[in-house]
Design a protein with these regions (language model features):
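Switch/communication elements of ASCE P-loop NTPase nucleotide-binding domains
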Residues: 1-47, 237, 241-368, 375, ...
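Conserved catalytic network of the ASCE P-loop NTPase/AAA+ motor domain
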Residues: 19-20, 63-69, 92-96, 107-109, ...
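Conserved P-loop NTP-binding catalytic core
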Residues: 39-95
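Short glycine-/polar-rich loops that comprise or flank the Walker A/P-loop
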Residues: 68-73, 96-101, 137-141, 310, ...
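Flexible glycine-/small-residue-rich
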Residues: 77-79, 145-148, 244-246, 334, ...
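Electropositive, glycine-dotted interaction segments
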Residues: 80-182
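Extended helical coiled-coil dimerization/tether regions that scaffold
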Residues: 153-156, 165-285
Length: 400
């Protein structure tokens, strides 16, 4: 199954745009050009983490630079052959494996009505209204924001790692683990008996109990003590934390780049190990290069493309990723007057031929031109110094 393209009309900074995708696609463009808005348009149709409240668009979600009362987002799929889709969408897929999903919002006197549609094509005869986006249970989008909650996700996912490792044990390993489990349990019970014998643990709440006794005679029936119970071995195991180990010494994991790599690797491994036979998922990751050096940016982008199942869409500001990415899989967004446009309607042979035409000249410096509105071509380093000096003398900041 392939997400071929998306059509957007009247949504945020998109007046009307069509964006084509490949199996692995890279969305680039300047800041505030609309990369996140493009991904959110897809999420409105496919992200099962969104609620009914999210579908009720606000005034700011409609195209702002003209009087707009309608939003249409339409996604086109081709090569729909997956059993989990075909079996659950009877009559919605054409003989040549095409399917269309549509989300339409109409604003009338501040009242917003939204509807979902599905069909073999985008014609009025084929595109029928459906009650809800029920298909998200087996056809969905998984999204990683550029603002990642590193430790929240890592702490939430550690139990999944433990359970996966637990399920993959050999029979002889299970026997050895069970014996060790019993041994640890007995030692924890011994610790539980000894900790309350420490004088400062036993007497720490003495003043508190005296104060409670003065407040009410009923407090005499119960004493307040520190709970030192550690005998729940499962709770002890679940409370383990990730750390970096060097020569038998544990260290706190440091560096945002390192944490970012752990986050994405953990997320990718979960996706790789999960059973996706009953669903088709499109993966969207915003700015995977955060906090990483150039060579690690390239390596991480390549890793995500290989490790993640299904179609992968990345957004990036990194010329290092652009210079190594497949040319016919690059989607460039740019602004013209008050709307966001898509170069060559997304992934296309035109962009591939243009990049391939650079040949050996393709590097990080030419790749920066993809993020620019204009490019000044110079012959060599001398001319480059000349233009930089000239700009400085004229008070022009070329990076602005």
């Amino acid at each position: 199954m392939h997400l071929d393209h998306i059509y957007i009309k009247g949504f945020r900074n998109f007046k009307e745009a069509t964006v084509h995708f490949n199996k692995h696609s890279l969305v680039i463009g300047a800041n505030d050009v609309g990369k996140t808005n493009l991904i959110y348009a897809m999420r409105l149709l496919l992200d099962r983490s969104l609620s009914d409240y999210d579908y009720e668009l606000s005034d700011s979600d409609f195209y702002a630079y003209e009087d707009t009362n309608e939003v249409i987002i339409r996604i086109y799929f081709t090569d729909v052959k997956d059993d989990c889709i075909v079996a659950r969408m009877p009559g919605k897929i054409s003989d040549d494996g095409k399917m269309v999903l549509q989300y339409r919002v109409v604003k009338n006197n501040k009242k917003v009505d939204y509807h979902f549609y599905c069909g073999k094509s985008d014609s009025d005869e084929d595109l029928g209204e459906i009650d809800s986006p029920f298909y998200r249970k087996f056809l969905n989008l998984k999204y990683i924001s550029s603002r990642r909650d590193f430790w929240g996700f890592i702490n939430k996912s550690k139990n999944l790692l433990l359970n996966q490792a637990k399920e993959n044990r050999a029979p002889e390993t299970i026997i050895a683990d069970d014996a060790l489990y019993e041994e640890i349990t007995k030692k924890l019970e011994y610790v539980d008996e000894k900790i309350p014998e420490l004088s400062y643990v036993k007497n720490a709440t003495e003043q508190l109990n005296k104060a409670l006794d003065k407040l009410s005679i009923h407090h005499r029936e119960q004493k307040i003590v520190f709970d030192t119970s550690t005998t729940e071995i499962d709770r002890v195991i679940s409370s383990v934390s990730l750390a970096s180990k060097h020569e038998d010494k544990n260290m706190i994991i440091g560096g945002e780049g390192r944490i970012n790599q752990i986050y994405l690797s953990l997320w990718a491994s979960q996706n790789e190990n999960s059973d996706l036979s009953n669903e088709v998922s499109i993966i969207c990751v915003e700015e995977p290069e955060a906090y990483l050096h150039p060579h690690q940016q390239r390596e991480l982008a390549a890793y995500l493309g290989k490790a993640l199942k299904g179609e992968v869409i990345l957004t990036s500001h990194s010329p290092f990723i652009v210079s190594e990415f497949s040319p016919n899989s690059i989607i460039r967004l740019y602004k013209y007057e008050n709307e966001t446009l898509v170069a060559s309607d997304g992934c296309s042979k035109v962009i591939e031929e243009g990049i391939d035409g650079l040949g050996y000249r393709m590097s990080v410096i030419p790749a920066e031109a993809f993020f620019s509105d204009y490019a000044i071509l110079v012959e060599g380093p001398s001319e480059l110094l000349l233009y930089k000096t000239l700009a400085t003398q004229l008070g022009l900041d070329l990076d602005r």
